[in-house]
Amino acid sequence: EQSGQRNMVAGLGAYRLSRSEGDWNLSDISDQITYVRKQGGKGCAFFRAGFVIGNEKGLYNELKNRFFKYPAQLPPLTWMSATHAAPCEPQEVHVTRERGGLRLRWEGSPDCLYTLYYAQADSIDLASARSILATGIRTNEWFLPINADAEREYTFCVTASNRYRIESRPSRSTYYYFSRYDK
């Protein structure tokens, strides 16, 4: 309530998992993450990073496999932007097949960061984190390695974000059917 419309993140003491610092159970941190999410928190910061990276009591694995399974965008900094205006949406994604995968290209401003969404279906649920293939892309292209033996359909679209992380509308969706046979 008192955040002034700024993003507040909870600081969680990953160091408390250490025997010398409290010997907490992994469930203590997991319960705190769940609580923060239920309260509408914008994220968590873990102190100290070495305990996360060092996988103390399996914390890194728990975060990667349970809580932060999919890429996520950083929240917008709307209070810093005078206009709150989103950048123009990028142009349609163009897909070309290359050895080992697909090359995705689009047109957009060089001042933006891009988020690439995809689905292995004919439509994309932009509200689902599962649909984010990559975020924070600094160029207008991406290479997606794929299994050349599997026939599969893909749908792609891209959004642009300005320096305040305000996201544009999505580009038009591009449908691509990958086949091991040339068509």
Residue ranges and their predicted role:
Residues 111-131:
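Extracellular low-complexity, O-glycosylation-prone stalks/linkers
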Residues 140-144:
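Short strand-edge motifs at loop-to-beta-strand transitions and within beta-strands
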Residues 132-139:
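Short beta-strand segments within Ig-like beta-sandwich modules, predominantly Fibronectin type-III
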Residues 62-111, 164-183:
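Pro/Thr/Ser/Gly-rich low-complexity, intrinsically disordered linker/stalk tracts
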Residues 12-14, 45-49, 106-108, 120, ...:
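Active-site proximal loops enriched in glycine and acidic residues that flank catalytic Cys/His/Asp
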Residues 145-168:
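Beta-strand-rich modules
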Residues 17, 53, 123-125, 167:
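Flexible, glycine-rich phosphate/dinucleotide-binding loops
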Residues 3-81:
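Substrate-binding cleft of secreted/luminal carbohydrate-active enzymes
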